[in-house]
């Protein structure tokens, strides 16, 4: 299936914005101001070709979470292509078959048996979010915490709630509740109905890694606002989409991703999906 690139929006850190616009110093005189604007446009245009591959500050996404909620499950991008945009991330696979987790450049498909299978490059994804992970902030977690408490702790250490963050937590867990969803057949059910057949796994006294993202509230409909985490065991053998956890201690790392690039399906069910609805209740049902 052909893929068409859409640059949805570009978010730059304040220091970058200041640098780009430093040429616009005042309103007196048209020549300097016009020159500054032209150089700004050129700077942004020159940046676009550089952000599609191998950029640690780019969060790259395939399709939207609302499209997935509405049952747009046909894969549109091979994992071999997805790997050129990141070595860390989460998502799902063609037909909603299992949970995707990428860590240290290795991609895994966690199926309904809870096993994490290494992924071949030919399998496709209908929805995924990836980046090249480079930690900007690190924290030591010494106290036990449930999922909500862990998220609150991370929130307290965010430079801003308005940026995108890749989140990695290595730790010891007394309990992890995770899930995976079986492959769906057409006509596809919406995701809130498809998860009724999910498999739930419970891990006890296990070491492993949480992989995921924290996205701002203003991307509702595009991605999952707040935290979206998947889990994989330390030996990379099992895991799933995180529903609940009890963490004993660990190390957290945040990667600030100040640029957001999204690729949308160029045909298929996405074209006719009734996007723009308020699907918050469905999202909460699916995520919890």
From Swiss-Prot:
Pathway: Polyol metabolism; (R,R)-butane-2,3-diol biosynthesis; (R,R)-butane-2,3-diol from pyruvate: step 2/3. Gene3D superfamilies: Hypothetical protein, similar to alpha- acetolactate decarboxylase, domain 2. It holds the Pfam family AAL_decarboxy. It comes from the Archaea. Coiled coil: none annotated. One of its GO terms (molecular function) is acetolactate decarboxylase activity. Keywords: Acetoin biosynthesis, Decarboxylase, Lyase, Signal. This is Alpha-acetolactate decarboxylase. Converts acetolactate into acetoin. InterPro entries: Acetolactate_a_deCO2ase (IPR005128). Residues 1-23 form the signal peptide. Its EC number is 4.1.1.5.
